[in-house]
Amino acid sequence: MSRYEKLLHMLMDYDSTIMFTAIGDTSGNILWNTIRDDSKVQVPLPEIKKTLVRESNDWISRCKIEDSDDLGRALYHIASFEKIKQVTIPLDAFHLLMVYVDNTPLKKTKTKSYGRYVEMGKIMSIVDFVNTFEE
């Protein structure tokens, strides 16, 4: 099992709200993925491929911003939708990690709910841990 496959399995084991994980290249090819079978929301694969290409281009723009040293290095990007949160993390110059998290509110509230909290510290710790291993 490659370190990228280990990463995907560790993320799925870590949090039951993670519905889908994938590692893709900058051309939109999905190289590895895991899907939670009991997920209520299914993200269409063609949409994920389009998103990978779009996010790859966005990371190029973010890298130009970080070259200015004012903000520092970009770590991850979160796009929030009513049903999911989409997290994108660059693994290296050629691979992106995509994590789709269930965004259904935890409980019905009288005030408007904007979904679930994504524990990026823990997700990034898993990414860093797996990246310490050699292929």
Over which residues does each language-model region extend?
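Non-catalytic interaction/Regulatory regions outside core domains
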Residues: 1-135
